[in-house]
């Protein structure tokens, strides 16, 4: 249970370490994070802080969201995210509070969640890393097919979860234990080592790494 930030993926670039080594980094814009709601165990059944970021035209905000943001006294944002916190940590926040990138430090490990790029309808070889069937020697029309998808009359059905062709990508995805290389407090940017899911300008959520003991 720890606080994170919501933002967008700007893109990838590289920076140079003091020894001249090249470090590939992803630039994340974490500006304008603000608290929209405090959820407590008494009223909501769990403790969490709800956060939004960015800005949205008033004409693009529905009445339910407009009322929600107005109640918090904040400008309408692009989306909402929640971070579970302890009751003690929750007491440090109130609706309207700003959250800056300074909650993270250089060298800290974080988990970054985004929506992966959609690849359209794909076969099992591309989607699930299946192997191709034989190129010849008795095989004439089944080179890239998945093969058998079941057994016989018993059980007489395809089991749920069977890996088959279908939509590839465009799903929520998390990359764990990415190292923060730089924190730009002036521009509210975070530079993490490596790649994160999604296309440019896609929404991302950054949390302290679970595996690092956060």
UniProtKB/Swiss-Prot annotation:
Entries under HAMAP family matching the protein: Ribosomal_uL3_B
Subunit note: Part of the 50S ribosomal subunit. Forms a cluster with proteins L14 and L19.
Residue spans of biased composition, Polar residues class: 130-151
GO cellular component: cytosolic large ribosomal subunit
Coiled coil: none
Taxonomic placement: Bacteria, Pseudomonadati, Pseudomonadota, Betaproteobacteria, Neisseriales
Stored NCBIfam families: L3_bact
Family named by the database record: Belongs to the universal ribosomal protein uL3 family.
PROSITE patterns: RIBOSOMAL_L3 (PS00474)
Modified sites of kind N5-methylglutamine: 153
Protein name: Large ribosomal subunit protein uL3
InterPro entries: Ribosomal_uL3 (IPR000597), Ribosomal_uL3_bac/org-type (IPR019927), Ribosomal_uL3_CS (IPR019926), Transl_B-barrel_sf (IPR009000)
């Amino acid at each position: 249970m720890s606080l994170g930030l919501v933002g967008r993926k700007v893109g990838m670039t590289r920076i140079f370490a003091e020894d001249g080594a090249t470090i590939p980094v992803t630039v994340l814009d974490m500006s304008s994070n603000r608290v929209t709601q405090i959820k407590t165990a008494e009223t909501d059944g769990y403790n969490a802080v709800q956060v939004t970021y960015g800005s949205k035209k008033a004409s693009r905000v529905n009445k339910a969201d407009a009322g929600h943001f107005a109640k918090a006294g904040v400008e309408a944002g692009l989306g909402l995210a929640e971070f579970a916190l302890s009751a003690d940590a929750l007491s440090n926040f109130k609706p309207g509070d700003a959250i800056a990138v300074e909650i993270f430090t250089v060298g800290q490990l974080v988990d970054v969640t985004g929506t992966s790029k959609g690849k359209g309808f794909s076969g099992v070889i591309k989607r699930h890393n299946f192997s191709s069937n034989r190129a010849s020697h008795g095989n004439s029309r089944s080179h890239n097919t998945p093969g058998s998808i079941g057994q016989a009359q018993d059980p007489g059905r395809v089991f749920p979860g069977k890996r088959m062709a279908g939509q590839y990508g465009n799903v929520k995805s998390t990359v764990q234990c990415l190292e923060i290389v730089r924190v730009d407090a002036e521009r509210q940017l975070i530079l993490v080592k490596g790649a994160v899911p999604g296309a440019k300008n896609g929404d991302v959520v950054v949390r302290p790494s679970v595996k690092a003991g956060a």
